Amino acid sequence: SAKYLINSMPFEGFYGAYRISGRYYQDLELENANEYLHEISFGSEYKRKKETRERRVHSAFAVAQHDEVYYDRDDGSARTSGGVIVDERMNYLRYGPELSARQSGEKISFGLNAKGQLWNYEDTDIVPEYDHEYFLFSLFGQYKFTQTSLLRVTARYYSRRYGDRPAFDLDGQQRVGNPNIRYDYLALGLRARQRLGESMWFGFDVERTERTDQYVGYNDFIRDSFGFEFHWSPGRRFDFELNGSYRLYDYPNAFAFHEIAGGRKTQESVTGRILTSFRMTRHLSLTAEAHLQETVSSDIRIQYDRTRYLIGVRWDQ
């Protein structure tokens, strides 16, 4: 990523930024799993600090292009529908405004975050498109018990409103003529962090998310998430991070394979990640990462295990 400050005033600056991210696999057998994201944003940042109080406001308009191959999870080949290749189905252009604000004090901090986006997916006449509107609004409050421990409460509402995807009936069928899908989410989270000395801290997260299918409730769910994180910096050059999470879904109405004979849909997942970095120079670091993800479901189409190992270099300016 790169950011250029266009104009700077005592407490506010205007900027333009570019970010690129993705995954690239050298093995030709895995090239269909390559993903890329390019994002350009323009906005302003306000920051003012006085003694123990600080105020930050960030506003921007962002445009992003995401590209990936819509491939078969069993054999890795490009997906087809009715004999027609639909490998570009998951490519999309995303754009919209965003705003975040934070007020921090010696003990109490609070803030908000808001987004409004349009996601425009690649046209595929033979299958429904994933085009949708996305809205997000969140609030948080944080309290520092001591200089080394804090507790944060977060409330989020977000919504995805599709333009070309019929909603599901209670029998699991997605019939033409049904209203388009609209999913509304309400999440409440709790985070606790504790610092141990200057070089180490750990934290725990708990969150409950309720999704409402606004048609007849077929795809409603309740998701309980539990997470932990640990960070250790024994010196100026070395960093070590460990984090993991467990998610349990409760679908009261949905069926596996969207078929009544498949029985009630169940899903749970576990993720774990280890990241280490060694700073070789002021700007250059060597990094290594291991990532594990396992999803178990009565709908085996979404059940999988994945383990990734990465090694690379990172440049920070």
Predicted regions and their residues:
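Gram-negative and organellar
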Residues: 1-317
